[in-house]
Regions:
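Hydrophobic alpha-helical segments within soluble ligand-binding/sensing domains
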Residues: 1-7, 21, 50-52, 96-99, ...
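Structured segments of extracytoplasmic/periplasmic soluble domains
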Residues: 1-4, 29-33, 54-61, 82-85, ...
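Flexible loop/hinge segments that line or gate small-molecule binding clefts
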Residues: 6, 10-12, 94-109, 154-156
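Hinge/cleft segment of the Venus flytrap/periplasmic-binding protein
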Residues: 10, 14, 18, 29-30, ...
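Short, solvent-exposed amphipathic alpha-helices that sit
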Residues: 17-36, 54, 78, 119
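Hydrophobic alpha-helical
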Residues: 26, 39, 44-102
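Hydrophobic residues at beta-strand termini and immediately following loops
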Residues: 41-42, 111-112, 142
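Short, glycine/charged-rich beta-strand-loop motifs at protein surfaces that mediate ligand recognition
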Residues: 88-89, 110-116
C-alpha cells in the first residue's frame, strides 16, 4: 500500500481481550501513518462465513478499500476468498497452517505469527516453576514473526 490508502478493520468480539488488544495496537500504530485512513471498523466476527457475507456489503459501501486488518486468521481466510481478485491487501495474526498457505499463495498479504509450540511450552514452564516456588517475571514477551510471501518459506523451514 506504500503507506497510503483506505483500510477496514474487521475484528472478533471486542469483549475478548485478545481482539481488543490487537485492535488497540493496530490503531496506535496507525497514528504514525497519516496517509492511511480507517474507513470502517466492524467487530464480532471470527469465522469464515460471516466475513464472506459481510464483505459484499462493506465493498459496496466502501469501494475504495486498499486493505483490511483482521484480528483472526480464520476471519482473514474468509475475507481472502470474498475479496479474491480485488487487489485488497489482507493483514492478520495467528500461526495456523491454512493461513500460512494463504500467505504463500498471496491470498493473505501479511501475517503476524507466534509459535503455538512456544506459547504452550512457556506456559507450562511458568506453571512448573511457580509450583517449585521459583521467582519469575509475570510477563514474558514471545517473538513474533512478520510473514509475507517473500519470507514465509524461511519461516516454514525454521519450524522443521
Amino acid at each position: 500500500m506504500e503507506h497510503k490508502g483506505n483500510i477496514a478493520i474487521i475484528a472478533g468480539s471486542r469483549q475478548q481481550t485478545s481482539h481488543e488488544k490487537r485492535i488497540a495496537g493496530f490503531e496506535k500504530y496507525m497514528e504514525q501513518e497519516p496517509d492511511i485512513h480507517i474507513e470502517v471498523e466492524k467487530s464480532g466476527y471470527s469465522n469464515l462465513r460471516v466475513s464472506e457475507q459481510e464483505m459484499e456489503e462493506i465493498q459496496a459501501n466502501y469501494p475504495n478499500l486498499d486493505g483490511i486488518m483482521t484480528t483472526s486468521a480464520v476471519t482473514a481466510l474468509g475475507l481472502a476468498e470474498a475479496t479474491r481478485g480485488s487487489g485488497i491487501a489482507i493483514a492478520t495474526l495467528d500461526d495456523q497452517e491454512d493461513a500460512i498457505r494463504a500467505v504463500e499463495e498471496g491470498r493473505i498479504t501479511v501475517l503476524g505469527a507466534q509459535s503455538g509450540y512456544e506459547i504452550g511450552y512457556e506456559t507450562v514452564k511458568y506453571i512448573v516453576n511457580d509450583k517449585k516456588g521459583i521467582k519469575q517475571d509475570r510477563e514474558k514477551i514471545l517473538d513474533t514473526q512478520i510473514l509475507t510471501r517473500e519470507n514465509v518459506e524461511d519461516y516454514q523451514n525454521l519450524k522443521k
